[in-house]
Amino acid sequence: MRLQGVRKEDIMTTAPRIARLIRPLVVALALAGVPALALTSASSATATTCATTVAHWGSLTKSLSRMTSAPITNVRAGRNACFDRMVVDLRGKGAGYTVRYVPQVLTQGQGAVIPLRGGAKLDIVVKAPTYNINTGTSTYHPANSRELVNVTGFSTFRQIASGGSFEGYTTIGLGVRARLPMRVFILDGPGTGSRVVIDVAHHW
């Protein structure tokens, strides 16, 4: 392959000259203790920084006042590079929520304390039932009400427990490592369903 406008002899004479210019710079950086990939590493670190100071993140109460009769069908959780996520699945749309840090999470209707592992506790109230309001038939059947999801190995989550469902309100207790930034939002789908999403950051 021939490069237009560039002669072979130009390349042969220019390459050593460039090498002589670069070598002192590399040596100087090494003596200064700067790794060769420092700039690349810094750039990569900036790109992967977890932005928990932007809008919607924080440790104060998050709420949405609307309510729905669309029932809850599942609770699940997953891990992200910057946060742990809990998802409440609903068979329909329109759910509201109140999520806040509290000294103790109490069950719906009875007010009994829910024991939770972790240095801080999130009281999650989803404004939707876990049953069909017309028939009373349960729509969510966890195998263990004290361990709705196995969160072993999670960075922030320590325990997810049921607080029951009463008069269209459902409580879930989330034990976390410490009082860390969180955000809550609604996602539509799949299909005609929707999801209440709670993210809790790994760090401030």
Locations of regions flagged by a protein language model:
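Secretory targeting and sorting signals
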Residues: 8-47
